[in-house]
Every structure is written in C-alpha cells, then in structure tokens.
Design a protein with these regions (language model features):
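N-terminal leader/linker segments that initiate helical-solenoid repeat arrays
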Residues: 2, 6-7, 19-83, 90, ...
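Terminal, low-structured helical/coil segments at or just beyond the last alpha-helical repeat
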Residues: 3, 26-36, 42, 236, ...
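Structural signature of tandem alpha-helical TPR/SEL1-like repeats
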Residues: 41-50, 76-87, 109-121, 143-155, ...
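Helix-start (N-cap) detector for alpha-helical repeat units in TPR-like alpha-solenoids
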Residues: 62-63, 96-97, 130-131, 164-165, ...
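A generic tandem-repeat structural signature
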Residues: 93-176
Length: 286
C-alpha cells in the first residue's frame, strides 16, 4: 500500500516500520500547539471568572460551556474542561466543536479511543471541519495507523493551508517512516507559518541528522533554543549536533545547559562526559 505525496508528483511509498531511530536522538513526539479554535480565549483567571458568569447567567447555552471548557483545557484543568464539554453536547447533541474539543481533552489524557469517537462525531456533523480532521489524524498517528493519519492531515491542510500544526504532524508521520526529505519539507512549511515554537525546529533538525546534514541540524537547533531557552530536548539535541560536527565547546555548553534544566538527564550526562565536559567550567554556547 502506498501514500500519495501532498502535491502532484510521484507516489511516496511509506514503509511501515516501527520506531524509526534517528542517529542516537529520539523523534519528536509532541505537538507544538493544540488545534486551537478560532477566537480562542487566553486561559487567565479573569477570563475564567467572566465565562463562569456567562454560564451562570445562561445555564442552557451550550456555547457558554464550550467556551469555558476551552479555557479550562488551556489551563490544564482537564476534568473541569471535560465536564463543560459534556454539558455542551448534552444541551446540543449536534454541536460539532464541543465534540472536537472534548476529543482533544481525551487525547491529552491518553484516552485515544474516546478521542477518536468524538472526532468521528464532529466530522460526521461537519466533514470539512479542519480542526477535527487534524485532531483525528493525531490520534491515528499515536495509534500507529499512518495511512488513516496521512489522509486526515491532507484533508486538514486542504481545508486550512495555513494550519502549521497539520504540516508539523504530517512531518512527524513522514519522519517516523524515515521519509526525511518529505518530513523536512513539511517542517519547513510549519516553521514558515509559525516561527515562535521550538518543536518544528527540533523535528527538522532530527531529520537533517538522519540524512547526516549536521550543519543544517545545528542551525535549526540554534533557532530552537533561541525560541525556547528552557526546552530540554532542544539543548540536548543541539549538543549532539555540535558533537557530531566536532565542536566540543558548543557541545559541552549545550549539554551543560541541558543539565542545568535537569541534572539527572541521562543522555545529557553521557554526552557531557563524551565531549570532556567538566562541571563548574564555563563554555561558549553560541
């Protein structure tokens, strides 16, 4: 079975190989964003208080519960988010956005089958709902069903060509199947659409490493740590890239930064020792 590339051109066969290892570094598995809806509100106490007032004054309004549930979800208050989405769909069983939002909470909490059911319901109600297509694609990717995931990511991109997360997740899918040039193309598009998140830079850097382009990888990981200086994976992966380039100074400095974030990080400890790092010594990182 083959998967078709996103643009007209040759058919891309993706070998269904489990757990592609990338030159001693692990593939990025997270998502840089969480399929935010349009007009999503920031997860601030003031917004929660305001939305709780709206819910109190409109106890039968499913949109009020959906909006508050979205803010709870952004704040990591998953149980409260779930309760609000449950209420929203009980008030309006045809409320596709609430099903999609509840699917996101289920996915974040590892309940992939429940997430899949909610995304399916949302897409039954609106087959062109890009957010639900993206969310379902991520679930399929996590469930190691790459063909289904590929179709959903393509659908999400066809509906919303400006959706950085859809390109990022399709890139992860290509990467997991060792189709690194296609992965690099998708990560590049994601970076062009949103330049303030480290994960696409890390992911593209890993694919560059997999094709032995450590100079390009180091450049991406420079950007990753600039965007997110507290990102442990960015520092560790950057250190490995510079280690492979023979720049022990920057490698040691990057491993040291990783160890400052997590002194027990085994890969960083081993890498720091490999490049002759000494605790308490200062290193140039840039």
């Amino acid at each position: 079975m083959k998967l078709t590339q996103r643009s007209p051109g040759p058919i891309v066969a993706l070998a269904l190989l489990a757990g592609a290892a990338l030159a001693g570094c692990q593939t990025v598995t997270g998502s840089p964003t969480t399929e935010p809806e349009d007009n999503q509100l920031a997860a601030s106490p003031a917004n929660l208080a305001s939305l709780s007032g709206v819910v109190q004054n409109n106890p039968n309004d499913p949109q009020a519960y959906n909006m508050r549930g979205s803010v709870y979800g952004q704040a990591g208050r998953n149980d409260e988010a779930l309760a609000d989405f449950n209420k929203a769909v009980s008030l309006d069983p045809n409320y596709g956005q609430a099903y999609s939002n509840r699917g996101l909470i289920y996915r974040k909490t590892g309940k992939l089958d429940l997430a899949l059911a909610d995304y399916n319901k949302a897409l039954t109600l609106d087959p062109n709902y890009a957010t639900a297509s993206l969310g379902r694609g991520i679930v399929y990717r996590l469930k190691k069903q790459p063909f289904e995931a590929f179709k959903d990511f393509n659908k999400a991109i066809s509906i919303r060509p400006d959706n950085a997360e859809a390109y990022y997740n399709r890139g992860l899918l290509y990467q997991s199947q060792k189709q690194h040039q296609f992965a690099i193309d998708d990560f590049s598009t994601a970076i062009g659409l949103t330049q303030n998140q480290a994960e696409p830079y890390i992911a593209r850097g890993l694919s560059y490493m997999a094709i032995n382009d450590f100079k390009a990888a180091a450049g991406d990981l420079d950007d990753a740590v600039s965007v997110e200086p507290q990102n442990l994976q960015a520092w560790t992966t950057r250190a490995y890239a510079y280690e492979k380039l023979g720049d022990k100074e920057k490698a040691a400095g990057s491993y040291a930064r990783a160890l400052n974030l997590n002194k027990d990080h085994e890969a960083a400890k081993q890498g720091f020792a490999r490049v002759g790092g000494k605790m308490g010594q200062s290193y140039q990182t840039f």
